[in-house]
């Protein structure tokens, strides 16, 4: 039986993610843990997160998990979700400035306020609700139609320097990177565990992914 570890550092809707993973692939062992050995022993790892970036990095540091996450990123399939994706960039504007893990060359920026669509209507921040995702080819999009709608809740967004690392974009109102890819790492700004059948399909794809881009 293959296994997937969900990193528990005290910031994330872990129960919902674990339940969605179990539903997506009942034959996969789902382990919610902060134990470094258990994380490194798993076949795949999910790095979730909800909350403030400074708290995220502080919690990872307190649990001695920063190097663990970096090691996972070099050795096995890793899926970042929401704050977990943002933590993979160099730094974030949140809390003034917060250094992050640096897996992707880029920064986490706050949506400008007021935010207007082309019709002059004010868009709310945080960006909350369903939005379309335009895909770039990747195994985790298998059996998910392009422009499918996923569920978002965020006030900050990723801006990466290398466009080849962008696996998906969404508009609010301007295009922003909502999915990132690099070798065996895939990360999404949206919440697959809240995105109904397309979200479960993405999780199912991750749970059989070998970490290759083709």
Show where each model-derived region lies.
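Extreme N-terminal starter segment of soluble prokaryotic enzymes
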Residues: 1-5
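Structural alpha-helical scaffold elements that stabilize or flank donor/cofactor-binding regions
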Residues: 38-39, 72
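An anion/phosphate-binding loop that grips the pyrophosphate of nucleotide cofactors and donors
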Residues: 42
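Structural motif
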Residues: 46-48
